[in-house]
């Protein structure tokens, strides 16, 4: 029996904003498989690799993990400030080198990730959705700038952070 069921509580609702390299791939699959979490959306952001590559990785991971009924959207293709630094030596040319991934398991929504985040936050009860950025924080910053009236509706932000300075040191 899950912790949520034992405590008679609802799963925590999350939006996963990611740049799937190896770490984010694990985070996505764990979020989907965890009965204490309700994955409301997956958004991608340029980070470990280009937006095109990390989005393709996220779509392939949806197939691998059997993720269904969750909207996916691509977001920011570059950082807000400075050039994008791609650590090919860490995550490889694809951003997820190693496994041979299948073709996309889900179609992308016809909207920008920032707008999908806003739609989900607006649709759900205030204070019930946690943002979980595991990559660059560009989409989260753009969400706060574009939709300041929705920021107070966010339950919180749980992030996997890096460092200021050279990427992936």
Q: Whereabouts are the PLM-identified features?
A:
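Acidic, polar-rich low-complexity tracts and alpha-helical solenoid repeat scaffolds
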Residues: 4-5, 72
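Active-site histidine-anchored catalytic micro-motif
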Residues: 7-18, 22-60, 67, 94, ...
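A short alpha-helix-loop-beta-strand transition element characteristic
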Residues: 66-73
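Surface-exposed loop and adjacent secondary-structure segments within mature catalytic domains
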Residues: 73-101
């Amino acid at each position: 029996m899950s912790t949520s069921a034992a405590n008679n509580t609802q799963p925590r609702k999350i939006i996963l904003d990611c740049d799937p390299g190896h770490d984010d791939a694990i985070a996505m699959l764990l979020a989907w498989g965890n009965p204490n979490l309700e994955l409301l959306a997956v958004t991608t952001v340029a980070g470990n690799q280009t937006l095109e590559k990390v989005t393709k990785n996220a779509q392939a991971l949806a197939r691998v993990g059997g993720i269904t009924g969750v909207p996916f959207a691509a977001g920011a293709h570059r950082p807000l400030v400075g050039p994008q630094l791609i650590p090919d030596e860490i995550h490889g040319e694809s951003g997820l080198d190693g496994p041979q991934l299948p073709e996309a398991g889900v179609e992308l929504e016809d909207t920008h990730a920032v707008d999908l985040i806003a739609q989900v936050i607006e649709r759900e009860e205030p204070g019930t959705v946690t943002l979980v950025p595991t990559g660059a924080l560009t989409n989260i910053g753009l969400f706060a700038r574009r939709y300041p009236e929705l920021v107070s509706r966010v339950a919180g932000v749980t992030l996997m952070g890096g460092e200021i300075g050279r990427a992936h040191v």
